[in-house]
Amino acid sequence: MKWVLKTAEPAQVKSLAQELRSHSGIGGKTFDQATTLARLLIMRGIADPEAASRFLSPSLSHLHAPEKMLGLRAAVDRIDAAIERKEPMLIYGDYDVDGTMAVIILKTAIELCGGLADFHVPHRIREGYDLRDDVIERAAAAGVRLIISVDMGIRAFAPAETARRMGVDLIVTDHHLPGPDGVPKALAVVNPNQAGCEYPYKQLCGAGVAFKLAQGLMQRRLDPKDQNKLLLSFMKVAAIATIADAVPLTGENRVIAKLGLDALRHAVNPGLKALLEVAQISPNRAPTSTEVAFRIAPRINAAGRMDVARDVIELFSAKDMARARELAAKLDQLNTSRQEEERRVLRSLEDRISGDPTLCDAYCIVLDGEGWHRGVIGITATRVVERYNRPTFVISRDGEEAFGSGRSIRAFHLLEAVESCRDLFSRYGGHAHACGFAMPAANIEALRARLDAFARARLRLADFEPVLDVDAELHFGEITPELFQALRLLEPYGVGNPEPVFSAHGAKLTAPPRILKDKHLKLKLTAGAIPARVEAGDSPASAASAAGFGVSSTEDATQEMSAAAILASPRCHPDSASIPRRDVRTAAENRNEAAKNSAPDWRRSIVFDALAWNMAERVQHSPLLAGDAIDIAFTIGHNDHPEYGGLEISLRDLKREAKTSEETKTEAKVETRSERKASSVHAGPHPA
């Protein structure tokens, strides 16, 4: 993996930091949060002071006016008329997290405004993705005169024609990219990515578009004093979808995600509370974006992957905790089944790749198999991309039909690749880095050849090397509670706002790593050398400042900062002392405790427990031993465990310590001297 150290212009950092101190109240006595945040914001493309302030402190006032979205006003007019006439409406949504959350948002909003709304979420296997003619025909026969799609429909030309023929008005709300033929002929199309739409933010997920439609409807129908409370309630659900669908957490998405996660600490919906329970997330705090992505979203997705997503809508509609817990437990069990099926299919994929050398040489990997569960092929495609760093398509054959999912790397636009083969598909859709499709099984070989040719014309071998962006080099003594608190202002993390990654040179193992569950590593690391970028003679305080994290220039301030790191947690402690966990201390207390308990060279005595996820395989053939030095790339987190909690680091990558040219020369000289000495010993005395 290639590490790329990001840079920020010092003058820009200084200017933005001054603005943050002046207008946002961000500072710090022993640790300059403003400089830290300014540097990280600039490296994320946010250099304007007003944009930085909005990023750090999102509010409801930062939401764009919904009527700016093309088609939304016409959609609100038609829904408003249906409410007035007591017409039944049908909300037609996708079966993933984004689609089900969109259904919940719009259905609830319509009902709060006095309307009648039912929903349909297709069965993944029996019905597949997108609008279907037979569902529209059944709805029309039941008296439905308005169907609203959410998170789908932007390429549903034939179903739109069926709706028109049946006398049903169709409103398409979607966020997927329209095809080359434009958009379907519907009463209204609400999609910020359609041609002619001047909505200022294009990156909303499907539930985000549904949220904007709900916002516009409530502005039309409800008392203004009730709207903000309801918007925050809907944001809880929209935030889950926004994070799960991996859209950029910038602009309006950041407002939705940040405020929605904060509101989840006050969840009152029985379904939400039961879901947080089964995911083992404390109800007394806001969940993190990581917890949403890896604990909440998979359980919601499992319903649509393994069974029917209707259970998700029922969960969020439950009125009592007993029923909510029953449904949440069902989703939890479905997620366990999904994990087992995913492992089974992934083993088949690995066997196929290891047994076919041509696949490893392919610029685009296309794998197909009979009977692979269609609910997990997208996840397994992601796993193959993570392992081999190639665009990957996984296709499940079902007789004469085939259904596939694709996932991509940073340098390859997947939807463009798929569109170059559009004649091979019966239907398709997606984004730059994810897609889905259906096709005749007979076309798979042609697809494999054409996709690989398309990729070879656009990719270089260098594109297949994974790249890890590193925000700064950091010494263990600089990992402090104050740094962690500064980083928290950047949350929630996700696409477009990645969690800050740091690197450290020459971290030393105090013991051999422990292997956990045959996959992960637990390491005990102590600080290595001060990063090489620090010039000889610099003080520790200067070293910290050189990292770009604004530590005060006095030695006492540096000691206070580092003592705070040592005393904050039993996970970060001097070798020579066992320091009890305590509440926040004064600077004087920190100095006194550090003086009593720390070794004189305290910067080199700090020890961290570190977790390295899915890295056990990398040390099986070349074991790491106590005393070995490694270069690490890592993130900084916090464990809330009442006894063992505290600051912790998670490794994103590790490498055997790279020797500098000077170290190599020194070793060569030592080796040469040793060889000469040995030579003289073996040669015996000189003749007289």
Indicate where each model-derived feature is located.
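Acidic, two-metal ion nucleic-acid-processing modules in DNA metabolism proteins
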Residues: 111, 116, 254-352, 386, ...
